[in-house]
Design a protein with these regions (language model features):
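Membrane-proximal envelope and lipid/glycan-remodeling enzymes
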Residues: 1-407
């Protein structure tokens, strides 16, 4: 499937979007009945709310220690140790006194991510029922379900990065450079490794622009559209200013000052962590008396918890075996980005800490998704092999995440 597609307007498929949102909400509802993680519930791990409150009080640090949160300690002050964009999103609500807005924001962001995945599929004229199915495969049929259920500080940033990355991809396809790169900058402000998506976005933007301006060269695109980069630049500059004001360096957002890492012999990132983390990334759980002993920390087999990885590899093989015409350059670009990001996260000390599944690898799902969508055949053949993958992903993540939250 080609990345080059003339822009055209369509009536929004409101009914199918509503059905999709109801399907996602139904899965959440089942989980919430067991876990009590309802979207109107105040969350204890609310670092981003505390940070927004501190900013509104005129303070960059939190004012005191919260021992149950992962806080950076710098010059005897306590700071949120995660990238700051989620607090940006919460500022308006905290300003009006809604200090438990994070849970509802997490729910809304989850649904928005599903909607934009659906919109990406519809951009390529995928039939609506198929589009709903593949959106569900990406979302509730993957380990996204673990991080999308509530607003704990470790999860809501990943949830936001997932949605913002999909939005960046969608607007790149639609030749909306300003929106695409602005949402990409927001995603980087949630999960820094999303910076790796930039080459893919620029490739999509270039092809979308050339579809309507075939004579333009790269320099022509820059001359015509450089002002669209302003929102992205403003967002990036805000990160740099905050980082410098707090930690004296434009790229330091605080994680290196977590006691967990300052006390570690190898620090936060080290190639010495890679072997064990790679093993966890592809290992199925051990068994005891025939019962799988699912781990609740530091990851497990990505093909079990996010079967869309299998789907993507199968569609690559199918396209090659059938000698179909597809965008080889983009396929290589997607694979390169995914591999680099997966390898990058394996040099991190914790691989996600306490959770079910392999949540760090969720950051790769949006790029794998667009790679899969570009390879979907028009005649829907081979679609049925995804059905058991979806049910395996849904069942494992639903049961596993429920057990994690009720422990």
């Amino acid at each position: 499937m080609s990345t080059v597609k003339p822009l055209k307007t369509k009536n929004t498929d409101y009914i199918n979007i509503l059905v999709l949102c109801l399907c996602v909400t139904a899965v959440f509802f089942v989980a919430w009945t067991f876990t009590g993680q309802w979207p109107w519930k105040s969350q204890p791990y609310n670092s981003y709310i505390l940070q927004a409150q501190s900013w509104l009080e005129g303070r960059l640090d939190l004012g005191r220690d919260y021992p149950y949160l992962e806080l950076a300690i710098f010059n005897n002050k306590y700071y949120v140790s995660f990238p700051q964009f989620p607090s940006y999103a919460m500022l308006p609500f905290v300003l009006i006194g809604w200090n438990s807005c994070d849970s509802m924001i997490a729910f809304a962001v989850s649904l928005l991510g599903a909607v934009y995945a659906f919109k990406i599929l519809k951009h390529f004229d995928i039939e609506s029922k198929t589009a709903i199915f593949f959106t569900l495969l990406l979302t509730v049929g993957s380990n996204w379900l673990m991080t999308a259920q509530n607003a704990w500080v470790w999860f809501i940033a990943q949830n936001m990065a997932f949605t913002l990355s999909l939005m960046a991809i969608y607007y790149a396809l639609k030749n909306k450079i300003g929106l695409s790169l602005a949402f990409w900058a927001c995603a980087v402000g949630c999960r820094p490794f999303q910076i790796l998506y930039l080459p893919a976005l620029l490739y999509l933007i270039y092809n979308a622009h050339k579809a309507v301006n075939p004579e333009d060269k790269i320099i022509d695109i820059i001359k015509k559209r450089y002002l669209t980069l302003v929102p992205m630049a403003v967002i990036a500059l805000s990160y740099m200013i905050l980082n410098f004001a707090r930690f004296g360096h434009i790229t330091e957002f605080g994680h290196n000052y977590l006691p967990e890492f300052t006390r570690s012999e190898l620090g936060q990132f080290n190639i010495g962590y890679m072997a064990e983390n790679l093993k966890n990334m592809f290992s199925v759980p051990e068994t005891q008396n025939g019962i799988w002993q699912y781990p609740y920390a530091n990851g497990m087999c990505i093909f079990l918890v996010s079967p869309i990885f299998i789907s993507y590899l199968v569609y690559i093989a199918r396209s090659i075996i059938k000698h179909e015409k597809f965008d080889m350059k983009f396929m290589i670009l997607v694979l390169t980005i995914a591999i680099i990001e997966l390898l990058s996260i394996t040099v991190h000390k914790t691989m996600g800490g306490a959770h079910f599944g392999n949540r760090y690898t969720n950051d790769v799902l949006p790029i794998i998704f667009i790679g899969t969508v570009m390879l979907l055949p028009k005649d829907n053949d081979w679609e049925s092999f995804n059905y058991p993958l979806f049910f395996i992903g849904l069942a494992i993540n639903l049961v596993g995440s429920i057990m994690f939250f009720v422990q």
